[in-house]
Amino acid sequence: MSTEHKQYLSAVTLAAIGVVYGDIGTSPLYTLRECFSGHYGFDVRPDVVFGFLSLIFWMLILVVSVKYLTYVMRADNAGEGGILTLMSLAGRNISSRATSILVVLGLIGGSFFYGEVVITPAISVMSAIEGLEIAAPALDPYIVPCSIAVLTLLFVIQKHGTGSVGKLFAPVMLVWFLTLALLGLRSIIANPEVLAALNPKWAISFFVEYKSVSFFALGAVVLAITGVEALYADMGHFGKFPIRLAWFTVVLPSLVLNYFGQGALLLKNPEAIKNPFFLLAPDWALIPLLILATLATVIASQAVISGVFSLTRQAVRLGYLPPMRIIHTSEMESGQIYIPVINWTLYLAVVLVIIGFERSSNLAAAYGIAVTGTMVITSILFCTVAWKNWHWNRFLVVFLLMVLLIIDIPMFSANVLKLFSGGWLPLSLGLVMFIIMTTWKSERFSLLRRMHEHSNSLEAMIASLEKSPPVRVPGTAVYMSRAMNVIPFALLHNLKHNKVLHERVVLLTMRTDDVPYVHNVERVTIEQLSPTFWRVVARYGWRETPNVAEIFHRCGLEGLSCQMMETSFFMSHESLILTKRPWHLFLRGKLFIALSRNALRAPDQFEIPPNRVIELGTQVEI
C-alpha cells in the first residue's frame, strides 16, 4: 500500500468516525442507566450488571459487526446504501406483486427513520446537558432551556452549511471515543472482574434467571445500537472499508471499554446508577467532559439531520414525496444539502419533544421501536437481495433470515411493549410520513394515468402538424413531458388557445434512474421526430438535482443548440378537482391536493428563469 493511499485511507476513516458513528457513539451517555430504570425493577446487583454488559457486548458484535458490517453492507447500488436503496435492489428480479410488498416494507423503514430522527437530537443533547446535575445540582432546572438553546443554534446554522465546522467533527469525535476508552479503562483497572461479562453465559443466565422481565429489558439494551442504520446509509460517502476499519479499530473498543467501565463502577458503587457515565470521571474533569459530551451529541444530531435531508432528496427524486426546495450548501460536495421545510418541521418537533418529555430517561422509552422495526425490515430486504439478485442458495438464505430474525424480532417485540410509555411517538410520526409518501405516489400515478388515458398518439399529432402546420413563430419552445410518448398538455392547450407553434419544438422528459449518479456521457438522449420536433430525455440519478442549463449544454454538444434566454418553456398547471369517493379515499385526495398546492413548482425545481416560463392551466378530476 502506497504512502498516499495510506494517508487517504486514514483521512476517510477519521471522517467516518466523525459522521457515521455519532449516534451509536453517544449511546453510553444513557444506555446502562436506562437498563436499571424503574421500568424494569432491577436492583444493581453483580449478576444483573454482568447480564446487561454481556447483552450489550454481544449485541454490538452480532448486530453491528456481523449483521451490518459483514452482510448488509454487501448490498449496495453503485456504492450507495440505505433502506430505500435496499428496497430498490430487492425489487429488481421479482414479480410485480412481490415488489409492491417490498416497496411497502421499504417505505415503512424509511418512515421509521423519520420517527427516529426526531428523538435522536433530543435524547442525545439532553443526556449530555444532564451532566449539569452532577457538576452543579442547582442548575438542574436549566437542563431543558439549555438543550433547546443548543439545538436551536444547530438548526439555525443548517442553511449556511456545515462544510467549515464539519472539518472539526472528526477530531472532536476521535477525542470523544478516546475519552470513552480512557474513562472506561480507568474503572476496569480498579475492578477487572467485570471483564467476565464478555462470556455469553452471563447473557444466557440473565434470561434464564429473570425470564419475562429480562425480555422486557431488551427494550433498554437496544439503546446501545441506535444509529446502526447510519453505517449502511452513509456507505456511499465513505466506502465500506473505511467504515469497517473505523469500527473495529476505534469505535468498538472504545464503546466496550466504556460500557464495562460503567459496569465496574456500579459493582463498586451501586449508587452511581443515577448517572454512571459522568460519575466515571474525576471531579476536576466533569466540566470538560460535559462540554465534550455536548459537542459529541451535537455532532451526532448533525449526522442525523444530514441523513434525513439525504433520505428526503432520494424520496423526492424517486417520486415518494412532492418536489421541495433543495439548497446545495457546498460547491465541492454534492451531498451537503439543506431542505428548509424539513429543517424547520424537524426543529419544531424536536423542541416539542424536549418540552413534553423533559428528561432523557422519559424519552428513552420512546427510543428503540423505530430502530428495531427498521432492523427487521432490513433483514427481510437483504435476504431477498441475496436470494434473487446474488442467487444464494435458497436454504442458506432461509437459514440466514431465521438467524437474523431470532435477534431482531425479540428486540422489536420488547420495544413494542413500550408503546404506551413513549413508543407511540416514533410510530405516530412514522405513520404520518408513510401516509404522505404512499398518498403522493399512488395519487400522482392515478393523476398521470387519468391525464394520459385520452391522449392521442404523439407521432400521429406531429405528422398532422407537419402536414398542415399552424402559424409558426421564430424561436424554440420547450414542452415539459412526463412521459415520452404522450402529448404534453401544455402543447395541446397552446395550440387550442394561441393557434401557433414555434419554429423548433423540444419535448423534454426528465427521468430518474435507479442509480445514485448518471455519467455525463449518458445524461442526454436526443431524437429528431420530424424536421421541427425533437425529443430530449434527460437522465439523472436519485442523488442528483436536475438542471435545465446543464441539459442545454449537453444538447449543444450533441448538435441541438438551445439558448436559455431565447427559449420559451411551456408548462401545464393542473387544478385538481376531487370527485365523489369513499370517505377514506376522499381524505387521501384532500391530502394530495394540499401536497400538490405546496409542492415546488417546476420552474423552481429545474432552475428555469421565471421570465422564460409560460404556464397553461387545466382542470383535472381525481
From Swiss-Prot:
Task: State where it is primarily located.
Answer: membrane
State the compartments where it is located: Cell inner membrane
> Which GO cellular component terms, listed alphabetically, does the Swiss-Prot or TrEMBL entry include?
plasma membrane
Q: Name one GO molecular function term.
A: potassium ion transmembrane transporter activity
One Pfam family cited in the UniProt record for this chain? K_trans_C
Question: Key word Cell membrane present in the record?
Answer: yes
Q: How does it sit in the membrane?
A: Multi-pass membrane protein
Please write the reaction equations for the catalytic activity of this protein. Answer: K(+)(in) + H(+)(in) = K(+)(out) + H(+)(out)
* InterPro entries associated with the record: K+_transporter, K_trans_C, K_trans_N, Kup
State the UniProt keywords alphabetically. Answer: Cell inner membrane, Cell membrane, Ion transport, Membrane, Potassium, Potassium transport, Symport, Transmembrane, Transmembrane helix, Transport
Keyword check for Transmembrane: yes
Q: Which domain of life is it from?
A: Bacteria
Any stretches that span the bilayer, and where are they?
A: 9-29, 46-66, 101-121, 137-157, 165-185, 213-233, 247-267, 276-296, 337-357, 363-383, 395-415, 416-436
Q: What does this protein do?
A: Responsible for the low-affinity transport of potassium into the cell. Likely operates as a K(+):H(+) symporter.
The record, for PANTHER family, names: LOW AFFINITY POTASSIUM TRANSPORT SYSTEM PROTEIN KUP (PTHR30540:SF79), OSMOTIC STRESS POTASSIUM TRANSPORTER (PTHR30540)
Q: Which family does it belong to?
A: Belongs to the HAK/KUP transporter (TC 2.A.72) family.
Q: What is the name listed in the Swiss-Prot or TrEMBL entry for this protein? A: Low affinity potassium transport system protein Kup
Q: Which organism is it from?
A: Yersinia pestis (strain Pestoides F)
Q: What is the lineage of its organism?
A: Bacteria, Pseudomonadati, Pseudomonadota, Gammaproteobacteria, Enterobacterales
